[in-house]
């Protein structure tokens, strides 16, 4: 079922029945599996008695993206191309700005459909395309379980204020998505370049070692099936323990839209009691979408609540026992073996354990001479090395370390009333030296 709340017509145009096909402009939901936008596009093509093509604009100037991110993305595109062909749908990838690619193929289209992202640049792309098209552009939201405006009509203060609002909608939106059958395939059309020609020799602005994760829906489905069989119970008990191997590792795939959060939630619910997994997947993740969608300053320290900004500035002159430069932090050259291990995990694998990411961000605040500079450093490192950086979860995760979505705590030096974390807590809760040893082993491989 595709709920009406997921669907928005962006420009009020009517279909052009002279068009040769319907075009789905894929950007945020890079999958053929459980994709509301794709299924809506198939419905549209069938109703207009047209074939369907899918187009993707491969731009080399997405903010802060490097070869690590592009490699994962292209692996996912290769996977979705194969899956779309099995459904009679041709994927066209062109190396140009995403709106330009859509506008090119819209010239011979009857109607256009797209998915939904929440970052400013994604909104700008959609606005640019909608204003230039002579055919309808319909946006279908598929990367959240509850559509953002349905969950809340304002930026929420915390998970505590957001949770009751989203929970009241879950029963209605937690329903399977039926796969449609396309009546007219597009495999014989030749609208654009061959896929491998489009991605061959693609050069990202910055070269970085690939992550240990391979992109694509097929890989995501395999990893998640293993998680349900072997790790779900462990996750419910030990999700915060960086020593345990309990995580689903779905965040990179959710970031690129290569897996559906609705599919994950329904499969996990079928597998057993999993309130902690659903809390992170639905409440925490979709709170980050709420944050980015409604905040005008999600990528800067000014996004913080007034109390957090004020208390950090009240303590800006507090002496730091340790201060580190960006270069020292990036190279994991601090006095703290636990922080160094977390940074190295991110650099080597492309992903950091969630609990360690909280500790990591808190220490950057503690070891930098100004909170605004600390904020920028944390975002820079997160966006550069994390496969799942540069997205709502990443922005919200960094902001949380500085007081976003949290309450005021007892006042102390440097942090003021922002929540504090220290290595004693790591030692008390976990066998944290085993975590350090494991990351050291990765460095030796």
From Swiss-Prot:
Its EC number is 4.1.99.3. InterPro entries: Crypto/Photolyase_FAD-like_sf (IPR036134), Crypto/Photolyase_N_sf (IPR036155), DNA_photolyase_2 (IPR008148), DNA_photolyase_2_CS (IPR032673), DNA_photolyase_N (IPR006050), Photolyase_Class-2 (IPR052219), Rossmann-like_a/b/a_fold (IPR014729). Residues 20-148 form the Photolyase/cryptochrome alpha/beta domain. GO terms for molecular function: deoxyribodipyrimidine photo-lyase activity; DNA binding. It comes from the Archaea. DNA binds at residue 239. Its cofactor is FAD; coenzyme F420-(gamma-Glu)n. Keywords: Chromophore, DNA damage, DNA repair, DNA-binding, FAD, Flavoprotein, Lyase. One of its GO terms (biological process) is photoreactive repair. The keyword Cytoplasm does not apply. Pfam families: DNA_photolyase (PF00875). Transmembrane segments: none annotated. It is an enzyme of class 4 (lyase). It catalyses: cyclobutadipyrimidine (in DNA) = 2 pyrimidine residues (in DNA). Involved in repair of UV radiation-induced DNA damage. Catalyzes the light-dependent monomerization (300-600 nm) of cyclobutyl pyrimidine dimers (in cis-syn configuration), which are formed between adjacent bases on the same DNA strand upon exposure to ultraviolet radiation. Belongs to the DNA photolyase class-2 family. This is Deoxyribodipyrimidine photo-lyase. It comes from Methanothermobacter thermautotrophicus (strain ATCC 29096 / DSM 1053 / JCM 10044 / NBRC 100330 / Delta H). The lineage of its organism: Archaea, Methanobacteriati, Methanobacteriota, Methanomada group, Methanobacteria. The gene is phr.
């Amino acid at each position: 079922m595709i709920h009406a709340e997921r669907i928005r017509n962006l420009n009020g145009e009517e279909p052009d029945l002279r068009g040769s096909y319907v075009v789905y402009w894929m950007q945020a939901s890079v999958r053929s599996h459980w994709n509301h936008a794709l299924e809506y596009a198939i419905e549209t093509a069938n109703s207009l008695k047209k074939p369907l093509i899918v187009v993707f604009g491969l731009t080399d100037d997405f903010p802060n993206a490097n070869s690590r991110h592009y490699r994962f993305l292209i692996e996912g595109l290769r996977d979705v191309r194969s899956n779309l062909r099995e459904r009679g749908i041709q994927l066209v990838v062109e190396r140009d700005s995403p709106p330009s690619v859509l506008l090119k193929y819209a010239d011979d289209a009857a109607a256009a459909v797209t998915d939904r992202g929440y970052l400013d640049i994604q909104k700008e792309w959609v606005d640019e395309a909608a204003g230039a098209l002579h055919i309808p552009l319909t946006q279908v939201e598929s990367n959240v379980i509850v559509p953002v405006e349905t969950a809340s009509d304002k930026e929420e203060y915390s998970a505590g204020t957001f949770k009751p609002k989203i929970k009241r909608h879950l029963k209605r939106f937690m329903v399977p998505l039926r796969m449609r059958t396309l009546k007219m395939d597009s495999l014989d059309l030749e609208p654009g370049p061959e896929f491998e020609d489009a991605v061959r020799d693609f050069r990202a602005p910055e070269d970085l070692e690939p992550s240990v994760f391979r992109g694509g829906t097929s890989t995501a489905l395999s990893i998640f099936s293993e998680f349900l069989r072997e790790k779900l119970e462990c996750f419910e008990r030990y999700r915060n323990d960086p020593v345990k191997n309990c995580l689903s590792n779905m965040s990179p795939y959710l970031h690129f839209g290569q897996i559906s959060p609705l599919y994950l939630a329904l499969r996990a619910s079928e597998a057993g009691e999993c309130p902690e997994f659903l809390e992170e997947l639905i409440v925490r993740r979709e709170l980050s979408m709420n944050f980015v969608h409604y905040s005008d300053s999600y990528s800067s320290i000014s996004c913080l609540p007034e109390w957090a900004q004020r208390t950090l500035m009240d303590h800006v002159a507090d002496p730091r026992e340790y201060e580190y430069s960006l270069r020292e932090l990036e190279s994991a050259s601090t006095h703290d073996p636990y922080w160094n291990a977390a940074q190295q995990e991110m650099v080597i694998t492309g992903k950091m354990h969630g609990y360690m990411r909280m500790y990591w961000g808190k220490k950057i605040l503690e070891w930098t001479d100004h909170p605004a500079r600390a904020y920028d450093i944390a975002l820079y490192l997160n966006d550069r090395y994390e496969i799942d950086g540069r997205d709502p979860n990443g922005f919200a995760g960094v902001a949380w370390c500085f007081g976003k979505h949290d309450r005021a705590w007892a006042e102390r030096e440097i942090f003021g009333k922002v929540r504090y974390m220290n290595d004693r807590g790591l030692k008390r809760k976990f066998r944290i030296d085993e975590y350090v040893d494991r990351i050291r082993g990765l460095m030796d491989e």
